[in-house]
Amino acid sequence: MAKKIEAYIKLQVPAGQANPSPPVGPALGQHGLNIMEFCKAFNAQTQEMEGGLPIPVVITVYSDRSFTFVTKTPPAPVLLLKAIGAKGGSGTPNTKKVGTVQRDQLEEIARTKWPDLNASDMDAAVRSIAGTARSMGIDVEGV
């Protein structure tokens, strides 16, 4: 018989840096999960990724207090800001621009995000990432 699912927990945890402090500890603790077991498993799975990059993770909690988790790709805005070397997006994206991104950079980000995007082809994925860039106040060239 399959295990009964109790809850889903969605977090963003820096790659390779999960520890029992907030937000991980309280989120897992309230469901009675072994926090250190998750931290060790998450850090082992994300050790080859760039350290400090926020990784979305969905933790499935079962009724016997066991769990499984699935990691996603880093958020597109984080990858875009890293590509242009900016600290944050623009508060007024239509008037104040924070940087410029080229099509090849967008393609690289789209390849990274491909497993989590619902685009039908790579060109659609690039256009989706370009839309995110424009909404952050980043000039897009070549799209």
UniProtKB/Swiss-Prot annotation:
Modifications the protein undergoes after translation, according to the UniProt entry: One or more lysine residues are methylated.
GO CC annotations, alphabetized: cytosolic large ribosomal subunit
One GO MF term: structural constituent of ribosome
Entry-linked SUPFAM superfamilies: Ribosomal L11/L12e N-terminal domain (SSF54747), Ribosomal protein L11, C-terminal domain (SSF46906)
Record key words, sorted: Methylation, Ribonucleoprotein, Ribosomal protein, RNA-binding, rRNA-binding
Keyword tRNA-binding attached: no
GO BP term, example: translation
InterPro entries attached to this UniProt entry: Ribosomal_uL11, Ribosomal_uL11_bac-typ, Ribosomal_uL11_C, Ribosomal_uL11_C_sf, Ribosomal_uL11_CS, Ribosomal_uL11_N, Ribosomal_uL11_N_sf
Function summary: Forms part of the ribosomal stalk which helps the ribosome interact with GTP-bound translation factors.
Subunit architecture: Part of the ribosomal stalk of the 50S ribosomal subunit. Interacts with L10 and the large rRNA to form the base of the stalk. L10 forms an elongated spine to which L12 dimers bind in a sequential fashion forming a multimeric L10(L12)X complex.
PANTHER family linked to this entry: 60S RIBOSOMAL PROTEIN L12, LARGE RIBOSOMAL SUBUNIT PROTEIN UL11M
NCBIfam families: L11_bact
Family: Belongs to the universal ribosomal protein uL11 family.
Name listed for the protein in its UniProt record: Large ribosomal subunit protein uL11
